[in-house]
Design a protein with these regions (language model features):
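Bacterial extracytoplasmic/cell-wall-associated proteins, especially those involved in peptidoglycan
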Residues: 6, 21-192
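Long, low-complexity intrinsically disordered regions
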Residues: 1-5
Length: 192
């Protein structure tokens, strides 16, 4: 649960919390994360001023995916990756759970058979940066609790700028945030 946003709460923040709040205070992150929703009273920045986030299996799957896919990115980049995962959960052509989406194709055993590359890179998934995991855990909690998905315009795909996959030419580019480019199918209209 979010802590009080009173004057004393800032003194209790750990370094990861301070970094999160600092990134929210930068204009581009506020705009990217739905300033209109905050202004309308629909969302509050206080949700990112919370103690260590926790949750069930779906939270754990989302937090792990964010850790392995976006832990070094800005808050906006982490939220954008979370949006893609949650947009897939809502889309009929993907599994209807976060864990199903995140692990889709992992059973194939193929190097590039996974929807999220960390599941098929041949390396064990080990969370060694606890501060980074705490950060993405907070993002996962906020997103699962219903933070408006306004960054990627309904994207259900993304890739790093280090690659140029052929499939991307068939889709509509919706955003470029940090090292990722986001897409949706051309016949898909954002519903979130």
């Amino acid at each position: 649960m979010p802590r009080s946003s009173g004057a004393g709460s800032l003194a209790n923040l750990d370094l990861a919390d301070r970094n999160t709040l600092a990134s929210l205070q930068r204009g581009e992150d506020r705009t990217a994360l739905g300033l209109a929703g905050v202004a309308a009273g629909q969302q509050s920045w206080d949700v990112f001023d919370q103690a260590k986030a926790e949750g069930g299996t779906e939270w754990r799957c989302l937090a792990e995916a964010l850790y392995f896919e976006a832990r070094g990115e800005s808050l906006a980049g982490q939220v954008a990756v979370a949006e893609v995962i949650l947009n897939r959960v809502d889309a009929a052509v993907f599994p209807d759970t976060v864990c199903g989406v995140v692990h889709q194709g992992a059973a194939s055993g193929k190097l590039h058979g996974c929807q999220f590359s960390y599941n098929c890179d041949g390396r064990p998934e080990h969370i060694s940066e606890t501060g980074a995991f705490d950060q993405v855990g907070r993002v996962a909690r906020v997103m699962l609790d219903g933070w408006a998905r306004t960054l990627t315009d309904g994207a259900t795909y993304y890739h790093t700028t280090a690659v140029r996959p052929r499939w991307a030419r068939k889709f509509h580019e919706t955003a470029a945030i940090g090292p990722h480019v986001f897409y949706r199918r051309p016949d898909t209209i954002a519903r979130n």
